[in-house]
Each structure stands twice: as structure tokens, then as C-alpha cells.
Amino acid sequence: MAVQQNKKSRSKRDMRRSHDALTGPTLSVDAVSGEKHLRHHVTADGFYRGRKVINKGSDE
């Protein structure tokens, strides 16, 4: 079983944990529809950066 050789101080422990915080997904609002979506992703209705890039409903 692993046993530490020297006790880690609260400061060292907290410095190690400083990178453990979780962040939520970054959301953007579409300029055309006002819909929220993930950054650098197409919205559900097919718009990306104000342009229609996917025609949903027309299966070719």
C-alpha cells in the first residue's frame, strides 16, 4: 500500500486541485434564429454563422 513520505500542506493540496474545476459548455446565440447552440456547431435547424448550411427535410 502506498504511503506518503512527507505530509502535503493544505496549500500544496489546493494548488493541485486548482485545475479540477468543471466548466459548463460554452453556448452561443444564432444571429438568424436566436437559438442557443454549442460554439462551432450547426444549430438544430441547419444554420451556421448566419448561413443555412443544411437543408433538413429534403432527402436526396
Curated annotation (Swiss-Prot):
One of its GO terms (cellular component) is large ribosomal subunit. SUPFAM superfamilies: Zn-binding ribosomal proteins (SSF57829). It holds the Pfam family Ribosomal_L32p. The keyword Ribonucleoprotein applies. Residues 1-28 are annotated as: Disordered. It comes from the Bacteria. Keywords: Ribonucleoprotein, Ribosomal protein. Residues 7-16 have a biased composition (Basic residues). GO terms for biological process: translation. GO terms for molecular function: structural constituent of ribosome. The keyword Ribosomal protein applies. Belongs to the bacterial ribosomal protein bL32 family. This is Large ribosomal subunit protein bL32. It comes from Cellvibrio japonicus (strain Ueda107).
